[in-house]
Amino acid sequence: MANKTILFNKHLESNAKMVDFHGWDMPLNYGSQIEEHNAVRQDAGMFDVSHMTVVDVIGNDACAFLRKLLANDVAKLKVPGKALYGGMLDENAGVIDDLITYYLTDTNYRVVVNSATREKDLAWIAKQSQGFDVTVTERPELAMIAVQGPNAKAKAAAVLSAEQNTAIEGMKPFFGKQAGSLFIATTGYTGEAGYEIIVPEDEAQAMWQALLDQGVKPCGLGARDTLRLEAGMNLYGLDMDETINPLAANMGWTIAWEPSDRDFIGRKALETLRDAGTDKLVGLVMEEKGVLRHDMPVFFTDSAGVEHQGVITSGTFSPTLGYSIAMARVPNSIGDTAEVEMRKKRVAVRVVAPNFVRNGKQAF
């Protein structure tokens, strides 16, 4: 039996096409993936992300524990509510998961991890927490709704109370705040402004309906994938996993090398990889007809005339740009052109930074 979120019946009411997503019954689309994608780029859309795992890390050693657990450094977080993105690595510097950590107080942090990795993550976190004065608590009674797009904040404001709107007024990107029963964060997975709202399960259906009534379009996993890919955001399991280190997954910016005496898990292996040089994750753009797809081989010739090969990790047709885009893992000697093998022939592609669309506009 697949797991169902508290919003399952709301999806059926909107004629969602449901699919199995890592053991969860989730909406793929509600009729038109393209319309859902465009709603987020041009107006406002919402996603049921209640399958995500919310974990509270509380105790005197919460900061010290997370400084060991994560490659990014939570000690950088000084303002209550500030969030941090980064990887949780194994001893070989493979990425166990990518996650967001919110600093609430010196002894209270909230971590949001992926659903596909839930059991593995919880077991790893529990194992690593031994010896630290911390309590790690999963919060399955909380649902989550992401409201994204240029008009998302205004439409969400219409369903929030006056007190909640006052509490989050002027909140900068990548912050989260408890406002009444809701935890409202200025985070997302689309490259647009908006909120991710953690809501008690018994309030989630009413909130979903209230957002629907404000004209927020329900969006499924299909649009979520094209939006995050346009924004150059990794999908765990495709763009990185335990066989891939963060330097080869465009996550170098999330590694806090300083202070040099912070011994986070995987640090020694990662330093060795850094010094030796690793592959890198780049963006590909193909303006010819056709669609770049996961696992297609990528070829390029370096300045010395030597041919190298890489692979597409994520690819799709970009509704915003009108042509195909992809992320690919390649040797770091790549220039600004390459070829992708599709249908037994090689097609020219441009190599760009893996960030294609931000706030509705081309970003490269």
From Swiss-Prot:
Top-rank taxon: Bacteria
One annotated GO biological process: glycine decarboxylation via glycine cleavage system
Keywords noted in UniProt: Aminotransferase, Transferase
Catalytic activity: N(6)-[(R)-S(8)-aminomethyldihydrolipoyl]-L-lysyl-[protein] + (6S)-5,6,7,8-tetrahydrofolate = N(6)-[(R)-dihydrolipoyl]-L-lysyl-[protein] + (6R)-5,10-methylene-5,6,7,8-tetrahydrofolate + NH4(+)
GO CC annotations, alphabetized: cytosol; glycine cleavage complex
Pfam families reported in the protein's UniProt record: GCV_T (PF01571), GCV_T_C (PF08669)
Enzyme Commission designation: 2.1.2.10
One term of GO molecular function: transaminase activity
Keyword hit for Transferase: yes
Complex and partners: The glycine cleavage system is composed of four proteins: P, T, L and H.
Role played: The glycine cleavage system catalyzes the degradation of glycine.
Family the UniProt entry places it in: Belongs to the GcvT family.
Family annotation (HAMAP family): GcvT
Name assigned to this protein: Aminomethyltransferase
Gene that encodes the chain: gcvT
